[in-house]
Amino acid sequence: FCTVIILILCIMKSTRCILSIILGLLAGWLPLGAVTVLKNLQVEYQTNPLGIDVSQPRFNWQMESDRYGACGQAYRLWVADSPEQLAAGRYIYDSGKVLSGESVGVVYQGKALQPSTRYYWKVSVWDESGTEITSTEPAWFETGLLGSGWSGARWIGSSETQLSKYRSHYVIDYDVRVAEGNDKAAFVFGARDADNYVSAELDLNGSGDARFILRHTTDGKTTQDASESLASIIPASDKHKAHHIRLKVTTAQYALKYFVDIEIDGKTLVNSSLTPEEKERKSRGDFWGGKEGAFTVYPYPDGELVYHCRLYAIGFLQPKGQTATFSNLCISEDTWNTLLYNPAETYVEKGEGKLNVWYPGENVSAPMLRKAIKIEKPVKSARLYATARGVYEFSVNGQKVGKDYLNPGWTDYRYRIMYNTYDITDLLRPGDNGIGAMLGAGWWSEHSGFLTGWQDQYGTRQSLLGKIVIEYADGTRETIVTNDSWKCYDRGPITFNGLQNGEEYDARKEVNGWDAPGFDDSSWKPATLFAAPPVNVEIQGYVGSPIQNNVTLTAQSMVEPIPGVYVYDMGQNMVGVPRLTFKGKAGQEITIRFGEMNYPETIPTEPVAPYTIAMYKEKKGQVYTDNYRSALSTDRYILRGDAAGETYEPRFTFHGFRYVEIHGLERPLPLEAVKGIVLESIGVRTSGYETSDERVNRLFSNIIWGQRGNFLSVPTDCPQRDERMGWTGDAQVFARTATYNMNVDPFYTRWLYSVRDNQGDDGSYANYIPVVGFPPHGAEDGGGAMGWMEAGVIVPWQMYQQYGDVRILEQHYASMVAYMDYLERRAVRYVQPFGGFGDWLAIEPTNSMLTNTAYSAYDALIMEQVAKRLGKDADQRRFRTFYENVKRSFNDLFVNEEGRTFAPTVESIFGKDSQVGMWPGTAATEAKIVDTQTSYVVPLQFDLFNEKNKPLAIRHLVENIKKHNYTLTTGFIGTPYLNLVLSDNGYDDVAYKLFEQTAYPSWLYPVLQ
């Protein structure tokens, strides 16, 4: 994603100017005749939006003319509460003629808008000749609830919690009694099949001390992990009594290891083999794995890339001739204290030496909720206001409501939940109507981020909040809300769903007509009521671009690498879900896997460990998924056996992929039966780029597809693996390009709410937003990496520059000032501390004190301009002074006499006891020359070199580029500015050579792979 950031659009200054520039260039050959129109009328940067939840919305329009130099000199804006009133001149707001050429962000100044009301508007513009042009296209906006409340609506859901077999943190409790004359009782968890599982065995050991033995079996080979005496817990006289076993299981990063804490009869089992150092480490825990359990089970210690330390199947493995009784079995989680599985059975296991396992909780599916309503009068309009803790999909009379996916999207639900507004007028019918909703895990529960401990980030059980307002033709209104009069069913077809791990769907469990009128729901249970969020959580009208499908791909080719396995190439790396159409027998299971590339047809002769030639031969042509790490990214579908065929499109997940691998078919699907439903949150495309060089065109296409894939509710770093997080560094370096490519003002406005919500008390911004971490509180440290935290300053500034969005500066200003306070407090001699990510993934690492300090200067430059735009004169002077001081210190401390970049020691700036940060590289223990591309590019872009040093820095930069044969050595923060700096300083020729380079590392290198 980040390696394709280029600045080929740098000639553009602002989206407000692009249209007039183009028309000016075309004026020489356009036909004569003054034709000027007003078009693209928008409210809050959206066309005819529903559910606007702001009291003073903003209006935009574009003036289009075939005459050179046409421009607006004045405008007049009218708003009415019906088309008839607008035509008759009876307005609720008339701006009067305003002598201004502004056409972006014009603020409504009329009387208070009413909630749940549609308003119509038009605008007139007077051009430079005084001619009045009035808009003709229909334009309206509709308010949301505007704080009017939810009319008693309650959060509803299921009384049961869906238990995933892919769960990585859980607690297993059970009672066990070994029959007289017997010695052993073995419980099993983590069973993927008969050759892969973990066993926890109580061994009464005849006349000896009872023992507890932990083993794992991998590919049929059994290894003992622990054997501990129970002499202090189970005396000889109690051996054959019932004993309570508790296994608290967690996993290491990427689910590579099981960590197990064991209690027997309420007493903790101590691992006697641990060294003092291991005990200390396990008690302390760390960022990557949290607190390790006392015992470790490592199924693949040789480092094979598998991520299978999960719950999977549970059961028993009784040795031959050994009988034991298991009872009071339950599985829970101890973060939100949720009981996940609690069967009533007592299991008497008579030893046959065979594995007896099952998937716990597989009968609980995604909740389905319904309500029957009756319409007895003609309907004028009907609106649905809805949100969920989780994700949801509404339907009315069997038809899906809206075009969105995975609503309400991702915000930090600890602070903010957004609701959606839908027009359901045309879905209602006279008489009986059926209202339905399904709930999925979404970002609320299941796995988040790149650590398997980051599970159930906000809770374990999903819930729905809804309100339907029906306005009848006679002027009366009826309101229907979610409450315990709704019915719930949790034995439906979606047997599992998670954004990272995929969806599992059993079509045999479909309930025909469940969301239609006349359905008999007498066997359904009343919906369970859930507590409302804490009072600090704001429930806000939806802001931003919803996740939708605007592009659909069809498979381009298919191969069969091994019999019965079919791999389809979509022709383009994409983000979304498949839509597959197939026929088969009832109960036939189809497994769908995804990959961005396949194992090569040509077998490497010297593979890099842990890969082997045998592995490459075995997997030749199949999808490669190791780069997904612990994200299983697998869908499963069980056919219902419909002779007419069945179509499957997952509802509550998404994948990043180019290749679709399908198992379980009797014959391959035709290409037209394999579709790729591209999901994205991007706005309207506002730019294009085409050259005579197909490599460059492909690069630009990659950039657009990269934006499509990573702009999904939040700006992510990657959409395919076990991360998918709103990394702020990725967001800020791409923000300028993103604002050129698409109308992303609503998208970024939405994300900046979370940026502010997650800001630290000290003013720092988080490294990824929404903040995720070990629940219930998320990441404790939040942030601290400069170049990442700068998203809180750079993104709103780019929005203002490209869209004229003053309001985002007003909304975000206090937050930005708090960040500047933070930078000033922690600086010493105007130098920022070493640490953070620095120039992440650079070929040549750059000292992070240098880049951190440079970014603090850039923050001050931006804030000087923001303060000026908002009329805050004292702040403007403050930030200018801060910038000048940083610049002076930078030249004194980071540049030597030859104009080369230089790294002083941390101690020389911060003292002996200073705490240095993390990678890349280490803090300088002795002063040394830096002399990397980034060390010149970043301060040059931020105008930090003084008059003496600037020409020297430019020369050294060019020398470095030539030394590396016109290839990139920059990383995240150096790459975006490199060509700009070269062009701005008279080196277009070097910039072109760098840009046209195809050797590694370069912009065009990945295009040719």
Residue ranges and their predicted role:
Residues K400-V401, I424, R429, A441-W443, ...:
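Active-site core of glycosidic bond-cleaving carbohydrate-active enzymes
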Residues T36-R118, K122-V176, E180-R246, T250, ...:
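Extracellular/oxidizing-compartment recognition motifs
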Residues L30, W155, L247, P1006-Q1009:
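Short, intrinsically disordered, charge-balanced linker/junction segments flanking boundaries
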Residues L32-A34:
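Boundary at the C-terminal end of the N-terminal hydrophobic targeting segment
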Residues C10-L19:
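Bacterial N-terminal signal peptides that target proteins for export
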Residues F1-I11:
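Short, Lys/Arg-enriched N-terminal segments with co-localized hydrophobic residues
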